[in-house]
Amino acid sequence: MQENPADAKYEISRAVKADLAAITRTYNASILERNTTATLHPVSIEEREAWFDAHEATNRQVYALREICDENLAGKDGEADCERKFDSDGKNLGAQKIGAANQKGKILAWGSLSDYHPREGYRITAEISVYAAPEARGKGLGKRLVKFILENAPKFGVKNIVALIFSSNAASLNLFAKFGFTRWGELPEVCDMSGKPESLTIPGKNLS
């Protein structure tokens, strides 16, 4: 079966610390929008490092979705998909090869699995989070990440996945519904978003 060119444009892999600057930028953009996370103030890369280390220590996964740049396309005028490098005089050196087979551009979205609850008995259940950079929305990247995470979660002993979503966030609720998530809970007005009460919907999915 021939690979869809659109599918070949992106790569999802486990994030590393070098990815945290891009991950932090995307998360902070979501914080300012006030509709996807209950974090009220922008976070620093150092704070995200502690978050990342906690995920690594508990074998919870953080994934980065980045574009893959075709070497033949990277130098074309108007091509914005590839991360470009410049010399000290500002000369465009083109997209620089990082991997052996592909050139990799910037991170456009990221997702994670986190502990649903710190007590040991809840280890079979994880919370999923997915964020896309503002300029990358509307491209189906969240869908790609959710699909990837669902396929890989059982390898790490995860049997149930839940999402914590503001009840007013119809786009996110619809995204998870497409993957068979059903409403497992509703917490009315449990969040204060700087004076605006938000209810929380909890979609869940059993992976067995």
Kindly give the residue locations of the regions a language model identified:
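A short beta-loop-alpha structural element at the N-terminal edge
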Residues: 11-23
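Helix-loop element at the rim of GNAT/NAT acetyltransferase active sites that forms part
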Residues: 25-42, 54-58
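Acetyl-CoA-dependent GNAT
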Residues: 41-135, 146, 206-207
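Conserved catalytic-core motifs of GNAT/GCN5-like acyltransferases
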Residues: 112, 120, 162-165, 182-199
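Conserved beta-strand-loop-alpha-helix junction that forms the acyl-donor binding cleft
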Residues: 137, 163-173
